[in-house]
Design a protein with these regions (language model features):
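Exposed, low-structure sequence patches enriched in small/polar residues
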Residues: 1-195
Length: 195
């Protein structure tokens, strides 16, 4: 951590990172059910490296985070299906492991405002994956949360508000209830809001 004086307050710069060498989790290696069955004992260990820097200015409650990830031997679930008259048919789930390196760049800008009981928190994130078929992410993601914070009878804290999310078009992962996991898919691209 480094701290700098700026306009009567402190600007802090933090750098961190990690290196993980992990076996793919149990369900990537073994799964037995009525509709899917696999035993993958020969999967390679995943290597995940992250370097990130965080610049934070307390006076304006502004944070800038820049991160770079590299993932080797990335394991993931993939689903495929055919849409026939609005129904999904020929649904198949596979476990895949990408043998190359996947690079992910993330730049996130956070800004928080408070005016009496009114609070507004916003985050704008830019992400770029060099392999969107294996690790799909939206290019831009915006999150905003507007709420009022107050106390009832000076003891009960209350937060009342709403949040909104927007992201650019991408192939969002599908949820598979049989596995209880998200799977990569290339059938339906999604974008827009979720509030």
């Amino acid at each position: 951590d480094l701290n700098f004086k700026l306009f009567g307050d402190t600007l802090s710069l933090t750098a961190n990172g990690f290196f993980h060498r992990l076996n793919p989790t149990f369900y990537y290696r073994h799964y037995h059910s009525r509709h899917a069955w696999w035993d993958n004992n020969s999967m390679s260990k995943m290597l995940h490296t992250r370097l990130q820097g965080i610049l934070h200015y307390q006076k304006t409650r502004t944070t800038l985070r820049i991160g770079i990830d590299e993932i080797n031997n990335y394991a993931y679930f993939a689903s495929s299906y055919t849409v026939n008259n609005g129904n999904r048919v020929n649904h198949a789930i596979t476990v895949n492991q990408y043998g190359g390196a996947i690079n992910l760049i993330t730049v996130a800008l956070s800004q928080d405002f408070t005016l009496g009981p009114l609070n507004w928190e916003s985050v704008i994130t830019y992400q770029k994956s060099n392999n969107k078929t294996v690790l799909p992410v939206p290019d831009f993601n915006i999150y905003s949360n507007l709420y009022i914070k107050f106390k009832i009878a000076r003891v009960l804290s209350c937060d009342f508000g709403a949040d909104v999310r927007y992201f650019t078009k991408y192939f969002a992962p599908d949820y598979n209830p049989g596995l209880g996991q998200y799977t990569v898919q290339t059938n339906t691209a999604t974008d827009g809001t979720d509030s």
